């Protein structure tokens, strides 16, 4: 009896997390893995995160719909932890359908997911405009933060409210009565027309209704039926509102713990946790970045890696791989294996550096401090590795990769004590090596 009580259920779910500041290349991995799983779930964030997928000579950027939508046998779910801009969602559905992929019957949206309203976007921009210089958070202006603020203040409007016009009108009028006072009295800006928003959002109910369901119930029934689930995170661990470089973070939990609260899938159903990291480091917007390179090397990384934000188009800051930060992310999210992306960006570097520790006030430290007042003062300590000066794009196995590229991967495994199982050696689906 004791053995039965304490036995662990067979794991049905895998979590995929970014282990840096976002933009790690999760889209390619999800696209590749989607034919191995029955269901792909997006569990947090909103249209502030872009996942880029390259296939059949096309490059597609998705912000809300899970990357698995391009596998015709895969069911995609937008979970309760996501905040949804209905305009962005409908545009994305149209984009996918224009590419020849049927969405109906394959896309499910949580009835409990919160909505991003026009006043959220307005307040997002107004709030950011009041901050100066380095204090700016670097928000995308998509209304993500204000929507989450309303969610936790218990004032949010959810997808289920969109389907009941009377409830929608009541909640919109109640919310805008308060928001307009803030906009006019504090920010001294023109108030938002309540009736115009009501008219606009009333039209979304028919368009979104076919996709809406209780996804928590749906997912757990699928687990009982033996289906497998891939839980896809947006952004990265270092942007987590609780565990990231606060205050320069996102408004949700990209770490693996957020996968459960943002989907309704319990932790005991999770088996593997795959961490995705670039072979170097990038960051968009403000915030501490110990290995940032403001020189020709940083410029080269950005140019070769095409480092521009998929959502905002902003130029990404670039630097060497930071093992101190990466080790922290691996620990916080309980990463069981790593997927290394954009290794090909390093193909032309004779010398490659990796940060192995920091110097802080004359002392060497190995733990990652998330607080700005400490992280802003650290200096990276680097280990130099030999570059490979060759392409690995045609390699079909780890053994076929250049010996120095193999040495780089092996070094990361030893330093992080986590196996690297997936190596992206180019943007295409077939430019992938498994270890």
UniProtKB/Swiss-Prot annotation:
Cofactor: Mg(2+)
Involved pathway(s): Purine metabolism; AMP biosynthesis via de novo pathway; AMP from IMP: step 1/2
One Gene Ontology molecular-function label: adenylosuccinate synthase activity
Entry binding sites for substrate: 310-316
Main location: cytoplasm
Binding site for GTP: 22-28, 50-52, 316, 342-344, 424-426
Enzyme Commission number: 6.3.4.4
Active site: 23 (proton acceptor), 51 (proton donor)
A GO BP entry: 'de novo' AMP biosynthetic process
Keywords: Cytoplasm, GTP-binding, Ligase, Magnesium, Metal-binding, Nucleotide-binding, Purine biosynthesis
Cofactor note text: Binds 1 Mg(2+) ion per subunit.
InterPro entries documented for this protein: Adenylosuccin_syn_GTP-bd, Adenylosuccin_syn_Lys_AS, Adenylosuccinate_synth_dom1, Adenylosuccinate_synth_dom2, Adenylosuccinate_synth_dom3, Adenylosuccinate_synthetase, P-loop_NTPase
Catalysed reactions, semicolon-separated: IMP + L-aspartate + GTP = N(6)-(1,2-dicarboxyethyl)-AMP + GDP + phosphate + 2 H(+)
Sites where the protein binds Mg(2+): 23, 50
Assembly and oligomerization: Homodimer.
Family from the record: Belongs to the adenylosuccinate synthetase family.
HAMAP family for this protein: Adenylosucc_synth
Function: Plays an important role in the de novo pathway of purine nucleotide biosynthesis. Catalyzes the first committed step in the biosynthesis of AMP from IMP.
Record's protein name: Adenylosuccinate synthetase
Protein's organism: Chlorobaculum tepidum (strain ATCC 49652 / DSM 12025 / NBRC 103806 / TLS)
Lineage: Bacteria, Pseudomonadati, Chlorobiota, Chlorobiia, Chlorobiales
This protein's encoding gene: purA
């Amino acid at each position: 009896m004791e053995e039965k009580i304490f036995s662990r259920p067979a794991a049905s779910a895998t979590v995929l997390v970014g282990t840096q500041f976002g933009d790690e290349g999760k889209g390619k991995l999800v696209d590749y893995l989607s034919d191995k799983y029955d269901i792909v779930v997006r569990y947090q964030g909103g249209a502030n995160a872009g996942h880029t997928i390259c296939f059949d000579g096309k490059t597609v950027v998705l912000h809300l719909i899970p990357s698995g939508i391009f596998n015709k046998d895969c069911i995609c779910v937008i979970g309760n932890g996501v905040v949804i801009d209905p305009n962005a969602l409908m545009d994305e559905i149209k984009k996918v359908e224009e590419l020849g992929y049927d969405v109906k019957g394959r896309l499910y949206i949580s009835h409990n997911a919160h909505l991003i309203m026009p006043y959220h976007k307005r307040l997002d921009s107004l709030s950011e405009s009041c901050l100066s210089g380095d204090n700016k958070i670097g928000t995308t202006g998509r209304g993500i933060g204000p929507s989450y603020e309303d969610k936790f203040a218990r004032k949010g409007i959810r997808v289920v409210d969109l389907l009941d016009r009377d409830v929608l009108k009541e909640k919109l009028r109640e919310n805008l009565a308060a928001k307009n006072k803030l906009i006019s009295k504090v920010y001294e800006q023109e108030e938002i027309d309540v009736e115009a928003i009501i008219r606009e959002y009333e039209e979304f109910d028919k368009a979104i209704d076919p996709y809406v369901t209780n996804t928590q119930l749906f997912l757990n029934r699928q687990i009982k039926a033996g289906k497998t689930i891939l839980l896809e995170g947006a952004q990265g661990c270092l942007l987590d509102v609780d565990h990231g470089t606060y205050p320069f973070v996102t408004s949700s939990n990209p770490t693996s713990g957020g996968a459960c609260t943002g989907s309704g899938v319990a932790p005991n159903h999770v088996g593997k946790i795959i961490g995705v990291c670039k072979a170097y480091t990038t960051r968009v917007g403000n915030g501490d970045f110990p290995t940032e390179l403001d020189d020709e090397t940083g410029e080269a990384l950005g140019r070769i890696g095409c480092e521009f934000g998929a959502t905002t188009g902003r130029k990404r800051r670039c630097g060497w791989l930071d093992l101190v930060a990466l080790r922290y992310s691996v620990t916080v999210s309980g990463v069981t294996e790593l997927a290394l992306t954009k290794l090909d960006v390093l193909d032309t570097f004779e010398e490659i550096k990796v940060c192995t520790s920091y110097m802080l006030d004359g002392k060497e430290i190995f733990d990652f401090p998330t607080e700005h007042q400490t992280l802003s003062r650290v200096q990276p300590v680097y280990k130099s590795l030999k570059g490979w000066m060759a392409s690995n794009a045609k390699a079909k196995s780890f053994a076929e990769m250049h010996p120095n590229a193999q040495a780089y991967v092996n070094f990361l495994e030893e330093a992080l004590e986590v196996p690297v199982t997936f190596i992206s050696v180019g943007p295409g689906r077939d430019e992938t090596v498994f270890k």
